[in-house]
From Swiss-Prot:
<dbReference type="InterPro" id="IPR036388">
    <property type="entry name" value="WH-like_DNA-bd_sf"/>
</dbReference>
<feature type="binding site">
    <location>
        <position position="23"/>
    </location>
    <ligand>
        <name>ATP</name>
    </ligand>
</feature>
<dbReference type="GO" id="GO:0006310">
    <property type="term" value="P:DNA recombination"/>
</dbReference>
<dbReference type="GO" id="GO:0005737">
    <property type="term" value="C:cytoplasm"/>
</dbReference>
<dbReference type="InterPro" id="IPR004605">
    <property type="entry name" value="DNA_helicase_Holl-junc_RuvB"/>
</dbReference>
<comment type="function">
    <text>The RuvA-RuvB-RuvC complex processes Holliday junction (HJ) DNA during genetic recombination and DNA repair, while the RuvA-RuvB complex plays an important role in the rescue of blocked DNA replication forks via replication fork reversal (RFR). RuvA specifically binds to HJ cruciform DNA, conferring on it an open structure. The RuvB hexamer acts as an ATP-dependent pump, pulling dsDNA into and through the RuvAB complex. RuvB forms 2 homohexamers on either side of HJ DNA bound by 1 or 2 RuvA tetramers; 4 subunits per hexamer contact DNA at a time.</text>
</comment>
<dbReference type="GO" id="GO:0009378">
    <property type="term" value="F:four-way junction helicase activity"/>
</dbReference>
<keyword id="KW-0234">DNA repair</keyword>
<dbReference type="Pfam" id="PF05491">
    <property type="entry name" value="RuvB_C"/>
</dbReference>
<dbReference type="Pfam" id="PF17864">
    <property type="entry name" value="AAA_lid_4"/>
</dbReference>
<feature type="region of interest" description="Large ATPase domain (RuvB-L)">
    <location>
        <begin position="1"/>
        <end position="183"/>
    </location>
</feature>
<feature type="region of interest" description="Head domain (RuvB-H)">
    <location>
        <begin position="257"/>
        <end position="335"/>
    </location>
</feature>
<dbReference type="GO" id="GO:0000400">
    <property type="term" value="F:four-way junction DNA binding"/>
</dbReference>
<keyword id="KW-0963">Cytoplasm</keyword>
<keyword id="KW-0238">DNA-binding</keyword>
<dbReference type="InterPro" id="IPR036390">
    <property type="entry name" value="WH_DNA-bd_sf"/>
</dbReference>
<dbReference type="InterPro" id="IPR008823">
    <property type="entry name" value="RuvB_C"/>
</dbReference>
Amino acid sequence: MDERIISSETVDAEEVSFETSLRPQNLSQYIGQDKVKNNLTVFIEAATLRNEALDHVLLYGPPGLGKTTLAMVIAAEMGSQIKTTSGPAIERPGDLATILTSLEPGDVLFIDEIHRLSRAIEEILYPAMEDYCLDIVIGTGPTARSVRLDLPPFTLIGATTRAGLLSAPLRDRFGVIDHLEFYTEEQLTEIVLRTSNILDTKIDDLGAREIARRSRGTPRIANRLLKRVRDFAQVRGNGTVTEKLAKEALTLLQVDPRGLDTIDQKLLHTIIQSFRGGPVGLDTIAASIGEERETIEDMQEPYLLQIGFLQRTPRGRIATETAYNHLGISYEKEV
């Protein structure tokens, strides 16, 4: 049993390969995020008709909602090549300059975790995004001089789980800013059925819905759970994922009916039992359960807020009456 099947923050090479094999090739195949898709369809068609590069796009939202996939789809819809990198991978101005000067007209540059770019790197991006040019310094000391290089028109797509950490000047240079929302149970059921078809896994509608119900609104988690439930179907069942088998498998994996895993439950139990339900600061919670603050902010908190189990206040986090009821703990309202 892997208690991180839900709350794992890392995506290993095997899972990246798995996700790549499942990715849709165009917007019509992309399930969910209808408002974002509808707007992008218009923007892409307009840019194509004008024979221009699409405006720079910022995609933000919790992990696993399809930001990277959507970037790939945008590039495919534009008929463009995509080059991918991440904020932590661009350590020096020269790293970014090398990437920018390798772009061809109409290319898409995708930067994941764009909030982790240093300010020095951001400043190089400003003229590149705004004027399609790159200012580089040649030489050192008194003989140093600045040279401006022209860049081909390109589209930068940035993805982040923490849009609030982006500097205002960088954020303002994106023409399209879209927030990816948690998926509905119906959308996730459709995703599970699509994935099972690609994996050649037999599954009935109720089995797919049970997996979707416990996937906390996140396609990556839905696909991850399907892989594990498929194992149980092959070893302990007849190869078909049914509702009964899905419930049994997910219970053994310690994923409860609302999609909470052991880390989520530990967090809520700590707030309720150690801090009388809160308010309690996030740093204190992190220290109490042995997790990084950033992990809680990215992996646990968004979903717990979404389903009403947690409240964020100026004084700290509070476990709600709904959370008490879910955990079977008596709730006493303060007078």
